[in-house]
Amino acid sequence: MERVMNIIKPKPDPKQLLRDWQRKLRQECRNIERQIRDIQKEERNVQKAIKEAAKRNDMVSAKALAKEIVSSRRTVNRLYENKAQMNSISMHLGESVAIARTVGHLSKSAEVMKLVNNLMKAPQMAATMQEFSKEMTKAGVIEEFVNEAIDNALDSEDMEEEIDEEVDKVLTAIAGETAAELPVAVRKERIKVPAQKASTSREEEAVAEGVDDEEELEEIRARLAKVRS
């Protein structure tokens, strides 16, 4: 009975499918733009916190916050890439519909399939693109495929070194001379030595202040994680 109903059921209009898909793609692009704005807004707050930490010579907090900014900016770059790929999907779908007017049906598009596959690897886009892939497979625009995980792992040491360089650039750009005046060895030493090892009364006071700083740092990290996800 189901096969009979499928035969009787008219094929969806390519133009209508295109309108529906492009509407969904535009909505996803707007969601990405909103997420980027939220991340950049939160980054401005983090920049203020970095300046305050640098003024009190708390380079542990300043560097940790700078690392969060580096991570956020990388997320923003990935979001812009996702948006660009969705715009490309919309463009290629328009071309497929134009061809369908001539041949009478939607043809498979290797480029759309490639773009959908790429976006399915992005955590923020995986669920949405899974739904898109089902609809497009059903309409004959792409072939059914299994999204295999691809190992894009880079050498951890090279990656860490690259991140450290970016962190230093962010610190210099935001904290300016305050961060630049501190020797590299001193900056690294401040990161390595735990606050609880302090023995003098002055250092003990710094530890007490550090507790509040750590709580503030965790709050900032939580807010950034929320807008990045």
From Swiss-Prot:
Alphabetical UniProt keywords: Coiled coil, Endosome, Protein transport, Transport
Major site of localization recorded for this protein: other
Assembly, per entry: Component of the endosomal sorting required for transport complex III (ESCRT-III), composed at least of VPS2, VPS20, VPS24 and VPS32. Interacts with SKD1.
Gene: VPS24-1
UniProt KW Transmembrane helix keyword: no
Protein name: Vacuolar protein sorting-associated protein 24 homolog 1
Listed GO biological process terms: intralumenal vesicle formation; protein transport; vacuolar transport
Compositionally biased region (Acidic residues): 206-215
PANTHER family: CHARGED MULTIVESICULAR BODY PROTEIN (PTHR10476)
Subcellular location: Endosome
SS bonds (residue pairs): none
